[in-house]
Amino acid sequence: MARLQDQYREKIAPALIEKFGYTTPMQVPRITKITLNMGVSEAVADKKVMDNAVADMAKIAGQKPVVTKAKKAIAGFKIREDLPIGCMVTLRGVQMYEFLDRFVTVALPRVRDFRGISGRAFDGRGNYNIGVKEQIIFPEIEYDKVDALRGLNISITTTAKTDEECKALLTAFRFPFKN
């Protein structure tokens, strides 16, 4: 079992029950999944770019990503239908908690000029989204072997009903919010 999973069961869940006054343990918000998404627009011109992006994502997430394809053709972007345009990974269970631990304790402090993550990126339904500008903040990526800096989107899906509950949950997981 992951370190953060133990911490959730032993400390975070009881603290949230006390703070919000839940009547049953099933009402306590928890993280259900983390989705990593990387859009690779350069893959339209060069197929090797997609292979490098998939390899980077596999190192970051610890599992093989799914290549996402264009749903319809867009002439302005030179995209045809079913053309590979990105990759994504959905993490659940132990791998999710391991990634969360590495992200909060190792990757976020490596961001240049880091002053905390935005406290406004909630979607109104208890989910949180973070945009990472470059993949080299993750320790699994070797700086010398990176062909291009690529950003990725991290979506944290929770069972929280409100943004306030979600922020309390993520703060308990030691997310460094700035506002």
UniProtKB/Swiss-Prot annotation:
Molecular function per GO: rRNA binding; structural constituent of ribosome; tRNA binding
Protein's UniProt keywords contain Glycosyltransferase: no
Superkingdom of origin organism: Bacteria
Keywords: Ribonucleoprotein, Ribosomal protein, RNA-binding, rRNA-binding, tRNA-binding
InterPro entries listed in its UniProt record: Ribosomal_uL5, Ribosomal_uL5_bac-type, Ribosomal_uL5_C, Ribosomal_uL5_CS, Ribosomal_uL5_dom_sf, Ribosomal_uL5_N
Disulfide bridges in this chain: none
Cellular component annotations (GO), alphabetically ordered: ribonucleoprotein complex; ribosome
GO-annotated biological processes: translation
SUPFAM superfamilies, per the entry: RL5-like
Function field: This is one of the proteins that bind and probably mediate the attachment of the 5S RNA into the large ribosomal subunit, where it forms part of the central protuberance. In the 70S ribosome it contacts protein S13 of the 30S subunit (bridge B1b), connecting the 2 subunits; this bridge is implicated in subunit movement. Contacts the P site tRNA; the 5S rRNA and some of its associated proteins might help stabilize positioning of ribosome-bound tRNAs.
Subunit note: Part of the 50S ribosomal subunit; part of the 5S rRNA/L5/L18/L25 subcomplex. Contacts the 5S rRNA and the P site tRNA. Forms a bridge to the 30S subunit in the 70S ribosome.
PANTHER family named in the record: 60S RIBOSOMAL PROTEIN L11-RELATED
Family: Belongs to the universal ribosomal protein uL5 family.
Name of this chain's protein: Large ribosomal subunit protein uL5
